[in-house]
Amino acid sequence: SFGLCRLRRGFCARGRCRFPSIPIGRCSRFVQCCRRVW
């Protein structure tokens, strides 16, 4: 969910996570939770 993604210091990205971020979960069905690698 959006809140959980925020707690894990991630952000919601539609479709795919773009470099330099990696997927760490989901915000919704078509939205991934991403986190920057650096």
From Swiss-Prot:
Disulfide bonds: 5-33, 12-27, 17-34
Segments traversing the membrane: none
Function: Has antifungal activity and antibacterial activity against Gram-positive and Gram-negative bacteria. Involved in the process of food preservation in the stomach during the incubation fast. May also be present during infection.
Organism encoding this protein: Aptenodytes patagonicus (King penguin)
Family assignment from sequence similarity: Belongs to the beta-defensin family.
Domain of life: Eukaryota
Summary of subunit composition and partner proteins: Monomer.
Tissue expression profile of the protein: Secreted into the stomach cavity.
Pfam families linked to this entry: Defensin_beta
Main localization, broad class: secreted
Protein name listed in UniProt: Spheniscin-2
Gene Ontology terms: biological process: defense response to bacterium; defense response to fungus; killing of cells of another organism
Keywords: Antibiotic, Antimicrobial, Defensin, Disulfide bond, Fungicide, Secreted
Lineage per the UniProt record: Eukaryota, Metazoa, Chordata, Craniata, Vertebrata
Keyword flag Secreted: yes
GO cellular component term, pick one: extracellular region
Compartment(s) where it occurs, according to its Swiss-Prot or TrEMBL record: Secreted
